[in-house]
UniProtKB/Swiss-Prot annotation:
Involved in cytoplasmic male sterility (CMS) by leading to pollen abortion. Not expressed in fertile (normal) plants. It comes from Raphanus sativus. The keyword Iron-sulfur does not apply. Sequence repeats lie at residues 94-106, 107-119, 120-132. This is Uncharacterized mitochondrial protein ORF138. Residues 98-138 are annotated as: Disordered.
Length: 138
């Protein structure tokens, strides 16, 4: 009985069945890698757009987004002059603000900070040091 790869080998310019198997497997492997690359680039683009939208919401800049084949498209809608919006938005798009939190206005003191207690600085419940004789090691 003629196998699939034997039939395909005549179609593949008279390759041997083994060579045909290798070429078919490598073709499917390359197709899988290409699809994985496309999916990962689409996913990372969407993650970057979502991060950008969160920053735009913090800055209270109006925007709209659209889903497309290549990811998410963000359009900024603002009555503010372009220069001011560009100054705020360009570091977000470049990824420079990623992971940084906004500073709150104030003296910079931490709320709920306890006052320093006066004392010797010793910890309660601390055990006393025990002296150990240094003898020869066995």
């Amino acid at each position: 009985m003629i196998t699939f790869f034997e039939k395909l080998s005549t179609f593949c310019h008279n390759l041997t069945p083994t060579e045909c198997k290798v070429s078919v497997i490598s073709f499917f492997l390359l197709a899988f890698l290409l699809m994985a690359h496309i999916w990962l680039s689409w996913f990372s683009n969407n993650q970057h757009c979502l991060r950008t939208m969160r920053h735009l919401e913090k800055l209270k800049i109006p925007y709209e987004f659209q889903y497309g084949w290549l990811g998410v498209k963000i359009t900024i809608k603002s009555n503010v002059p372009n220069d001011e919006v560009t100054k705020k938005v360009s570091p977000i798009i470049k990824g420079e603000i990623e992971g940084k939190e906004e500073k709150k206005e104030g003296k910079g003191e931490i709320e709920g900070k306890e006052e320093k207690k006066e004392g010797k600085g010793e910890i309660e419940g601390k055990e006393e040091k025990k002296e150990v004789e240094n003898g020869p090691r066995k």
